Every structure is written in structure tokens, then in C-alpha cells.
């Protein structure tokens, strides 16, 4: 999210005038793509780390956990008294203690990104509380780690600082890029990927040109053929200019 938001408005206009399209490829669900992000001028998005895609409001594909899979995971988490939330296109749905247990983890995660002072309510301003968590439209379920066995036992897991994501098996950003291209009659040869984290590696390896942010993690930088400047030093805009996008 930080990557694309750092592109200055005039450069966004230049990109569009040159006929290029920009798609957000993120771990976030559709419900987490707030108006200020769409206002950047995105042509579409891949969400849920590859579970969902749309272009100009048209849904291209949407994979979710089945109702039975969701129930099994929710019961697994409740049995262990873990705090969690469901990520759906319709919204984010939290377990009762997610705010209490989530604040310290959010703080740690933000500190690792050079930010401080944010809480669950600030990071997830539209979180939905107090509803049934047995659903058939969840793309991912994220929960807070409290024991080493959590990470080992959780099925379909993708780990980050203090938390684990449980998602649809067999999906990642790379396969989603290919699937989106097939849906919009696009070609891999025309793609450029920008990433900064381990979860971006399949996308970087899929696209014709792959760029890691200088401020990104080691796995992303090792997977990319090109490394641009840090996000906070206009690395994205510099890469756009370098590759003739603006």
C-alpha cells in the first residue's frame, strides 16, 4: 500500500496518458481498499494474496474458503483461544478479543516498518465486531500467534510478524497475475511488478520485469532483477521513470 501511495499525482496522470495500467496486488481484501486508494487512479486490483481480482469494478475471479473450511478454522482458533479476524470482500470480521490482543502486535508490526503509535482501530477503521464468524465468503483468516505450535500446525499459513494468515490453498500473487492476464487478454511480456516482501516473490518471478523496493525485505530484493530506491525516497516514481512508464 505504501508503495503505490508514494507516486505523485502528476506522475500518476503521466502514467495513464502513456497508456499504462496499474493494478494493486495486495494481501488486503476488497473491503480494505479504501476510497483514498482508488483515488490514486488504479485500473483494478488483486486482493487476498491472489484470491480475488477485479478491473474497473468488474470481478474477474473470487476464490473463498468454503463454509465448512471456515467453520473448521474458526473452531480451531476458538479451541485455542486465539484472537483472529476474517477477511471478506464484504468486510473484515473480528473475534471478540482481537482488539485487546491485536494492539501490541500491530504496534510491533508498525515499528518494523518505521511507524509508531497505531492501534487496531486505526489500522482497521472499518472492522466489524459482534457478528457470526461462520461465513462462506472469507478469502483469508488472520490470527495472532501465541505459541510456537500455532505456526507449525496452522494449515495454509503465510506468516508475518506476530501473526499467521490462513487462506485458500494453491493461491499466490504469481498465479493470480497469470489468471488476471488471461481474463483481460493481457500478456506476461507486458508486465512490470513492484514488490517489497516475501509474499511478493511469486509475483516478481512471474512478471517480465521485476523490481524490488530498496526498503523491502531481503527475499524480495534477492528475487528481483532490479532494485530501486527506498519507498520514502520516491523509489517507485524513479523506477517508473527508469522503465519509461512516465
Give residue spans per PLM region:
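Residue-level signal for inorganic ion chemistry
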Residues: 15, 26, 49, 131, ...
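Asp-based, Mg2+/Mn2+-dependent phosphohydrolase catalytic module
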Residues: 206, 210-246
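Conserved acidic, metal-coordinating active-site core of Asp-based
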Residues: 82-206, 215
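Short, acidic loop-to-helix structural element flanking the phosphoryl-transfer center
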Residues: 2-20, 62-71, 110, 168-182, ...
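Short hydrophobic/aromatic-enriched beta-strand-loop microsegments
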Residues: 42-50, 63, 156, 210-214, ...
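Active-site phosphate-binding/coordination module
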Residues: 7-101
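Short, structured coil segments at secondary-structure junctions
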Residues: 40-41, 49, 147-152, 206-207, ...
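Phosphate- and divalent-cation-binding pockets in alpha/beta enzyme and binding domains
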Residues: 32-35, 143, 176, 202-203, ...
Amino acid at each position: 500500500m505504501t508503495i503505490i501511495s508514494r507516486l505523485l499525482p502528476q506522475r500518476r496522470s503521466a502514467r495513464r496518458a502513456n497508456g499504462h495500467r496499474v493494478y494493486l496486488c495486495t494481501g488486503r481484501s476488497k473491503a480494505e481498499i479504501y476510497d483514498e486508494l482508488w483515488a490514486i487512479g488504479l485500473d483494478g486490483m488483486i486482493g487476498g494474496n491472489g484470491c480475488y481480482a477485479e478491473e474497473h469494478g468488474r470481478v474477474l475471479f473470487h476464490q473463498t474458503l468454503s463454509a465448512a473450511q471456515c467453520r473448521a478454522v474458526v473452531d480451531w482458533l476458538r479451541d485455542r483461544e486465539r484472537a483472529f479476524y476474517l477477511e471478506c470482500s464484504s468486510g473484515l470480521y473480528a473475534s471478540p478479543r482481537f482488539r485487546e490482543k491485536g494492539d501490541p502486535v500491530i504496534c510491533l508490526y508498525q515499528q518494523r516498518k518505521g511507524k509508531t503509535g497505531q492501534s487496531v482501530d486505526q489500522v482497521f477503521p472499518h472492522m466489524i465486531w459482534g457478528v457470526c464468524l461462520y461465513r462462506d465468503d472469507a478469502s483469508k483468516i488472520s490470527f495472532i500467534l501465541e505459541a510456537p505450535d500455532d505456526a507449525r500446525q496452522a494449515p495454509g499459513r503465510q506468516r508475518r510478524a506476530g501473526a499467521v494468515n490462513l487462506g485458500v490453498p494453491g493461491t499466490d500473487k504469481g498465479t493470480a497475475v497469470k489468471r488476471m492476464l488471461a481474463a483481460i487478454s493481457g500478456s506476461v511480456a507486458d508486465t512490470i511488478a513492484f514488490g517489497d516482501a516475501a509474499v511478493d516473490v511469486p509475483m516478481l518471478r512471474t512478471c517480465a520485469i521485476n523490481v524490488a523496493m530498496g526498503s523491502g525485505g531481503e527475499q524480495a530484493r534477492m528475487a528481483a532483477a532490479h532494485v530501486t530506491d527506498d519507498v520514502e525516497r520516491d523509489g517507485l516514481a524513479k523506477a517508473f521513470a527508469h522503465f519509461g512508464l512516465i
